[in-house]
Amino acid sequence: MYYEFDDDNIKSSTDKLISSNKIRKNPLFYGPYKVSKVVRGQSVSWVPNEHYYKGKPHLKKITASVITPASVAQSIKSNKFDVTQVSNSQWPNIKGTKGVNFIANIPLSYSYLGFKVGKWDAAKGENVMNKDAKMNNRSLRQAIAYGMNVDQVYKRYSSGLSFRIPTLIPKQFGDYFDKNVKGYTYNIKKGNELLDKAGYKKKGTYRVQPNGKPLTIHLAAMSGSKVQEPIIQNYIQQWKKMGLNVKLTGGRLMEMNSFYDKVQNDSKDVDMFIGAWSLSSEPSPQDLYSAKAPFNYSRFVTKENTDLLNDIDSQKAFNNSYRVKKFHQWQAYMDKEAYVVPVANSYNIYAINNKLTGYSLEPSKSMGGGFPNWYYVGYAK
C-alpha cells in the first residue's frame, strides 16, 4: 500500500487555511479560556470556554497587554496588573512593593556563545564545517571563553538572579547533568597563555592570526533590556585586554529578527554570536547540535560529536546508566572543544497580585514552560 500526495494542492490548501477566519478570527480552543478580542500589537482578551471539559473556570475575563520594558517597574508599584513578569535588572526597584507576591522559577533554557565554523547546505540538509574558518581554532575559542567575566557581570547587573552555567545540559535534568564539568570561569592569564601558544602574536594593541594576517572578530548580539549594551561592551573590553579585536556586527546590537536572519543564513559578518535556547523536557541535544540540525548555528560537525549524540539516542540508551554515561561524555567533549560555550541562565520572576489564588509554577500545578494552569486561578474577594 502507498499514498500519493499532490504537493501543490497541499500547499494551496495550507496557505488558504493560514489566512482563513478559522485560524485568524474564529479558531477552536481546548483550554479553559477562549479569545474574545484582539487589539493588534496591544492586547488580547480571553473569556471562559463553555466547552472546556472540566467546566467553568474562576475568572470572568483575562486581558494580556503589551507594555514597554521601561514601564514594568512603575506598573508593578501602582498595581496596574495582576500578573507581571519582572526583568532581573529591575528587581532592586520593585522587590519591596506592597500588595504583590513574588514567585520565580528557573526555566529550561540558557544563553550561549557560538562560533561560526561552517555553513548550512540546504540542498543536502546538513551542516558543512570549514576547517579553515577563522574561528576553527580550539585555543582561540577557549581563550575567548576565559575572557568572559560572567559571574561579575550578573552580580552587578542582575542582582545575582542570572548566573553562569557550566555545561549545555541544565542542572534540572538531574543525573544527565555532569557536575564534574566546570566550564570556563574568568581567567585572562590562562586566555593569554592559550593565545600565545597557538601563535596569535601581539602586534601593537591587538593580536594577529598565526599566518600573520590581522584578526578582527565580528560578534552578533541581540538588543534587549537597558543593561544589555553595557554587558556586551564589557565583554568586548575584556577581550581587548587579551589583545583580541572584537567588533559588533553592524556596529551595534541587533533586534531579534535581524540577528537570527544573519545567524541562520551564516552571514559573512558574523564570526561569533550570543544566542539562547529554550529546551523541551527531553534532554537530547540532537536537534540543536547534530550534523543535520538546522539549529546547529555554529555549523560544527565532528565524528566524535555525531557518535556521542547517536549513542545518547540509541537503543542502548534505554539503559539509563548507559545514557547518563554518554551524556557526561558529550558534555566533557563540548566543554573541551568550545564550539558552543554555555553562558548563563536566569530566574524568571513574576509579580502576582496577592488577591490572586491558585497561581502556581510548580510542575504538578502548572502547564509547564513558566505558565500556570489558568483553570485553577481565581480572585479572592
How would you describe each model-predicted region?
Residues 1-54, 61, 188:
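Gly/Pro-rich hinge or "lid" segments in bacterial periplasmic/extracellular proteins
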Residues 42-43, 50, 145-178, 227-237, ...:
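Detector for C-terminal structural segments
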Residues 31-36, 43-45, 60-66, 111, ...:
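Short, well-ordered beta-strand elements
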Residues 93-109, 113-117, 283-296, 354-359:
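Ligand-binding "clamshell"
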Residues 21-24, 49-94, 245:
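Ligand-site clamp/hinge motif
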Residues 47, 132-237, 241, 329:
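Append "and occasionally in soluble cytosolic enzymes with long acidic Gly/Pro-rich linkers
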Residues 70-81, 92-97, 233-242, 256-270:
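Short helices/loops that flank or line small-molecule/ion binding pockets
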Residues 47-52, 109-139, 156, 181:
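A bilobed periplasmic-binding-protein/Venus flytrap-type ligand-binding module shared by bacterial periplasmic
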